[in-house]
């Protein structure tokens, strides 16, 4: 345990951009450890040509395989995350929920993406998007 004397200032929290980028790595680690398929979407997951320098993201957005969303959320809740908005109350499309963690900040967990696929067909839609995924370093 680290202790601080009266003369030692408390460490500064990491900048928001660093915390969000590292949150993406954290989520990938959790997903890999539990064999859950996640796609990092929006924000820092976009290429730098699209997500231009000087623009900042305030959360980490994930698209999770629909059949694995409940298990992924349970794992996150057990790791200290709290629900800010449920699927049913967070969006008119009921496609995403928002979680908060005191260290990591906010994340939006998407179970589908509005406009992609039809109700009841989201697993097949995820398969198509999954097959076209690319690897990108977000936090390094």
Residue map of PLM features:
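Conserved NTP-donor binding/palm subdomain of two-metal-ion nucleotidyltransferases/polymerases, i.e.
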Residues: 1-58, 64-140
């Amino acid at each position: 345990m680290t202790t601080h004397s009266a003369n030692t200032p408390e460490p500064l929290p990491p900048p928001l951009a660093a915390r969000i980028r590292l949150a993406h790595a954290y989520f990938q680690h959790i997903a890999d450890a539990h064999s859950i398929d996640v796609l990092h979407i929006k924000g820092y997951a976009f290429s730098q040509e699209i997500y231009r320098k000087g623009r900042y993201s305030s959360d980490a957005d994930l698209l999770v395989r629909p059949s694995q969303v409940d298990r992924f959320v349970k794992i996150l809740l057990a790791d200290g995350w709290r629900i800010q908005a449920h699927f049913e109350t967070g969006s008119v499309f009921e496609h995403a929920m928002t979680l908060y963690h005191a260290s990591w900040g906010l994340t939006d967990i998407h179970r589908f993406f509005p406009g992609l696929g039809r109700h009841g067909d989201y697993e097949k839609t995820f398969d198509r998007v999954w097959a076209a995924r690319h690897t990108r370093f977000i936090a390094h």
